[in-house]
Amino acid sequence: MPEIEIAAGSGDNNDALFGKYELGKLLGCGAFAKVFHARDRRTGQSVAVKILNKKKLLTNPALANNIKREISIMRRLSHPNIVKLHEVMATKSKIFFAMEFVKGGELFNKISKHGRLSEDLSRRYFQQLISAVGYCHARGVYHRDLKPENLLIDENGNLKVSDFGLSALTDQIRPDGLLHTLCGTPAYVAPEILSKKGYEGAKVDVWSCGIVLFVLVAGYLPFNDPNVMNMYKKIYKGEYRFPRWMSPDLKRFVSRLLDINPETRITIDEILKDPWFVRGGFKQIKFHDDEIEDQKVESSLEAVKSLNAFDLISYSSGLDLSGLFAGCSNSSGESERFLSEKSPEMLAEEVEGFAREENLRMKKKKEEEYGFEMEGQNGKFGIGICISRLNDLLVVVEARRRGGDGDCYKEMWNGKLRVQLIRVCDQTSSTNAAI
């Protein structure tokens, strides 16, 4: 197996990744990533380091989007039953995730080795799963790929949800209020996804939770067939059989989870009140921390200071992942980013007005709501502008040279458009921070 290129950071700790993480044994390997056990030199704690080949990702836009989505989602989640993402780092060729190390491994392996679990243990894991899933839903995150392979067990026997690469955010919901992307593993796919008419992420996750619970107690999948189309037919019709050892209460509960009609399928709130679920005592879950979520940041300076590293990483000049996220690289090497308190809409209007005044050819990028490509007469220079919301208070403006003459680019960007945008930002804003 080829060695992973180790990139040391500043300092004398050249035998450690970025001078921070000492890599140990290989935990897993895939087509685009390897996961190593590692030790954090600063704390002595074990971590898992996922290493991805950026070049390979750039040849697979869908996977690159999954990685971007995973960073975006995991940095906003903090829950005892969700794997914690500590840090994201990068070199020119690789991306590194430093994550919580979950010693017990996959729940899937536990079932494969030891067979089905008792109802009591299954209930405990399921309660923790619902705690994590409900927490995600309360924050507009839908996992869409819940299965035992993505559920880990720590040394204390607690469940941890991982792998948010296929997750959806509320801003991916179309005007009809539904998601439309075909995601998930075949045996866990909800029937409404197969209809391709759109679906609600929360209800799809509940279905997958039902499949997981069935597998925990039965030791096998409710819908299984060597022929995938036959399996889909069974899912669509809800054709499955309970094992004889399932209790009547559990059969009733699973039937509500695996209701093929999403409109009548049990909800998270209803799950929390179900007799089978609460048996043995269960602490009521509070999915929203009102004290934290009601706090308001008083100024943009405070907001800049408190920004999570995962918010800034794709804009940082030292660890620039924006080439990966945009699916292309910046061959000219000229780019600049700054923060603004103005709305993306207002800044976009300024950019469009500037293009008209300067007689520049401009087109909007399909993949970005506020992304523009501008080109001077005869192709003398090209500028790419991306305006994206960073959080509730701040917006990032990014400019990149897209070929052409460097002096013309500097004249247009540094001498004109940048000045105009910053002037607009300064009209009512006290803060304008460069990144």
Swiss-Prot record:
InterPro entries reported in the protein's UniProt record: Kinase-like_dom_sf, NAF/FISL_domain, NAF_dom, Prot_kinase_dom, Protein_kinase_ATP_BS, Ser/Thr_kinase_AS
Induction entry: Up-regulated by salt, drought, abscisic acid and glucose, but not by cold.
List of residues binding ATP: L27, G28, C29, G30, A31, F32, A33, K34, V35, K50
One Pfam family recorded for the sequence: Pkinase
Phenotypic consequence of gene deletion: Increased proton extrusion and resistance to high external pH.
GO molecular function terms attached to this record: ATP binding; protein kinase activity; protein serine kinase activity; protein serine/threonine kinase activity
Recorded catalytic activity of this chain's protein: L-seryl-[protein] + ATP = O-phospho-L-seryl-[protein] + ADP + H(+); L-threonyl-[protein] + ATP = O-phospho-L-threonyl-[protein] + ADP + H(+)
Active site residues per record: D145 (proton acceptor)
NAF domain residues: 302-326
Any GO BP: protein phosphorylation
Tissue: Expressed in roots and stems, but barely detectable in flowers and siliques.
Keyword Magnesium attributed: yes
Keywords: ATP-binding, Kinase, Magnesium, Manganese, Nucleotide-binding, Phosphoprotein, Serine/threonine-protein kinase, Transferase
Cofactor(s), by name: Mn(2+); Mg(2+)
Gene3D superfamilies: Kinase associated domain 1, KA1, Phosphorylase Kinase, domain 1, Transferase(Phosphotransferase) domain 1
Region (PPI): 333-362
Annotated CDD domains: CIPK_C (cd12195)
Domain Protein kinase as annotated: residue spans: 21-277
Phosphoserine PTM positions: S167
Residue ranges, annotated region (Activation loop): 163-192
Entry keyword Zinc: no
Similarity annotation: Belongs to the protein kinase superfamily. CAMK Ser/Thr protein kinase family. SNF1 subfamily.
Self-association state and partner proteins as the record states: Interacts with CBL1, CBL2, CBL3, CBL4/SOS3, and CBL5.
Function statement: CIPK serine-threonine protein kinases interact with CBL proteins. Binding of a CBL protein to the regulatory NAF domain of CIPK protein lead to the activation of the kinase in a calcium-dependent manner. Acts as a negative regulator of the plasma membrane proton pump AHA2 by preventing its interaction with 14-3-3 protein.
Domain notes: The activation loop within the kinase domain is the target of phosphorylation/activation by upstream protein kinases. The PPI motif mediates the interaction with the ABI (abscisic acid-insensitive) phosphatases.
Record's protein name: CBL-interacting serine/threonine-protein kinase 11
Name of the encoding gene: CIPK11
